[in-house]
Each structure stands twice: as structure tokens, then as C-alpha cells.
């Protein structure tokens, strides 16, 4: 259903993406750091009857090229812009899990809203470092232990069982296209230091925040704190779910997103 394609960026990097290639309103999905497009397969099937579904493997992960270049959120946003331009996508529903949501916020900051209808954030607060202005950070990350704390292997964030076939595919792919966390460390620390609240306070399009109730990375109450930033933002909690909402609870995610899209 999802056919693999490739984009060569303006800095010469091959980006893999997957596309149902239908003439419907597009959903553009962005995995988090270290994750893969394969883990979106089940939720893609649910959306396919009503939407064109596109999911990107960000640079340095999935089937995309490994490179030392572009280990920053702005470059990931530029990759999205190049893909959107290549496919001439309009009226996009952009869905980002974890750092994928930050990539979308960076895209909005740099390129605006003209091609977007709505944003869905899957388990990513606007700020990762806990301080006096924001209490819902990433685990125990503070300015006192940043960035060394990010060298720890925190696992994949999965709380509940995911589809066996999809998991096997992802595991097989990870053996062929290995992800090296240490080679993406600069991107990880750049991601963690960002504060996207200025972008979200000024957000001009609707955004749904879905938080995993059992996420090992974030206190799900961050979603309700995000609601208070802007009346364009709404929040829902996905039960029995960790950090990878699209893989752990695809049906619950689909229902919440569809209900959200009907309201806007």
C-alpha cells in the first residue's frame, strides 16, 4: 500500500518516503528520532480510505541515507519543505511523533502555514528541559545535567504490545538499515534545547495534541498545559499507550484524529 520513493535534497542526501499516491487530501507523517516509517503501517491503513498518506524517513534513520550533515531541526524542516514542494502538497494534515512534531513546528516557523490545514502532535511537549517556566520536561532532564543526560539509552518508549507483523518488519529493517544513536547525538541535543512555545502561542491553524497516558518519557499532563497556550490547540489522552502512539494504539489515534478533523 505504501510505495517507497526517494528524494535527493539540496545538500545531496537521499531521503526515503512512502506514499499511497492517491488524489486525496494528504496526510504527511513524521517519525521521531531513531524511529522508522514502518511503524506507521497500521495507522496508514486506517486513514487510506479517506486520505493520501505519506510518511518520511528523516535523514539518518529508517531507510534514508546516513550522514554527518544536517544534524539540526531546521535542516529536518527544510527536508520536509523539499518533499512538500516536490509532491506539490496542499491542505496538508501534518502528523509528528516525538521529534517529528518539532520538525513540523520548525517547518511552520520557517515556511509558514500556506500548505497546512492542521497539525497533530503525538507525545511531544514544546520544551524538553524542565525549569521554572515549564514543569513537563523529558524525564529528569534539566539545565544542570544537559546535554550529558541525553547520552543515556532510554529505550524505545513503547508501553503496550504492537502489531506482531509490523514489529517483525521494523526489526528486520533495523538490521539492514542500522540506526546509530551516537552518530545522531548532535541532533538529539539540539532537539532537546529547543522551546517551541513562541511558535505555538502564535499558531494560526488547529493543532491536536495526543499524549500517551503511560509514556515513559513525558508526564501526559503536558498536553493540557499546551491547550492553555493557544485556543487553536486541543488535547486528548490515549489510554494504555506509551510514546509511540501511532504504533501502540493506531485505532484510538485514528478515532481521535478523525473526530478532531470533523470539528475544524
Q: How would you describe each model-predicted region?
A:
Residues 105-110, 115-147:
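Flexible "cap/lid" loop of the alpha/beta hydrolase fold
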Residues 130-137, 144-202:
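Conserved alpha/beta-hydrolase catalytic His-Asp/Glu region
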Residues 13-66:
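Conserved HGGG/HGGXW glycine-rich cap/lid loop of the alpha/beta-hydrolase fold
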Residues 1-27, 49-51, 90, 258-264:
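Alpha/beta-hydrolase fold catalytic core
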Residues 207-241:
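Conserved loop-alpha-helix segment in the C-terminal half of the alpha/beta-hydrolase fold
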Residues 75-92:
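Conserved acidic catalytic loop of the alpha/beta-hydrolase fold
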Residues 96, 100, 104:
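Gly/Ala-rich beta-loop-alpha elbow adjacent to hydrolase catalytic centers
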Residues 232-264:
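Catalytic active-site module of serine/aspartate enzymes centered on a nucleophile-bearing elbow/loop
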